[in-house]
Amino acid sequence: MRPSRTLTTAAAAALVLVLAACGSGGGSGDDSGGNSGDSGGDSGPTAGKVGVILPDTASSTRWETADRPLLERAFEEADVDHDVQNAGGDAQRMATIAEQMIADGVTVLAIVSLDSASGALIERRAAQQGVQTVDYDRLTLGGSAEYYVSFDNVRVGTLQGEGLARCLDDRVGNDESVNIAFLDGSPDDHNATLFSSGAHAVLDEMEGYTSVAEQAVPAWDPRQAAAIFEQMYTRADGDIQGVLAANDGLADSVISILGRDGQAGEVPVTGQDATVDGLQHILAGDQCMTVYKPIDQEVDALAELAVALIDGDEPETTDTVRDPEGDRRVPSVLLDPIPIYRDDVKRVIDDGFQSAADVCIRDLEDICAELGIE
């Protein structure tokens, strides 16, 4: 085998009712994804079932284009019965999917929480039913997951901070202060907090940088990001020389606003996720860098951990991560992110994470050829 949004009080109360009402099981009827593998009978050599609930399609394209197919392939190769679904950005829908998975007999449930309040309720319900839980990619604050699988998210922010400093290097000095803006991820995504802390740990300690604006983007929504950055840019009278954008989706929004003022490519912008758009912006010179997280490694780590739990073994971990709300340390598998600049785009293509056919289009064909991307 392969290696092998914080809820309002009313919404949280409604979610409790959903979790309680769905406890008796029943037909799924959910259209967010289907079962992979048999739901009954012989499930193969590995006796157990894994459920994975992805969060949405808006915060990143990765969930459906990368995580879902890779997860399904990993569990198929491990000969493990599995069910991978997507909550579509709806916390109550995620709760309903979780209850159905529990009723269908999952022994391990991995979730990417939309927010910690709803995620913690799901994990509590799963524990009551004897289902082991894993936080995948995002730590559920105040939750009860036994394990956490993700990339080192503070390191992601560190790479972004170092990247922005590198791209602004020739502008710092001569007693001039460079104005930078921070466009952070969703305020109810703990990863966004970690990204920001890593970036600030770099830039706040360096001379020559002044933070003139910082704001989180609810639900990582690119449309809101564009509106937020436009306000930042206007209030600063366009006097912003660099932007720490938490991912490629937010970076795309920033670049669109800068483009209206003829500043796309003049103001370095960071990103994350090595998306097609992000790589294209880097090749075109409009984006400084992105952070590449080989999702196949994260998927394989989750598959290995889930199989170990099903087999009754203690999974191998690399670290522990502190849950500040639960006042506990969660055994974790943390993977290393990779900075990607213009000369590194080829690596992402060679890894098969993105394809040259998708990235190297129109005016970028010659640039790709120059960089040996094919």
Model-derived regions: residue spans:
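Sec-dependent bacterial lipoprotein signal peptides
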Residues: M1-A20
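A residue-level marker of the well-folded mature domains of exported/periplasmic proteins
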Residues: R2-S4, C22-E374
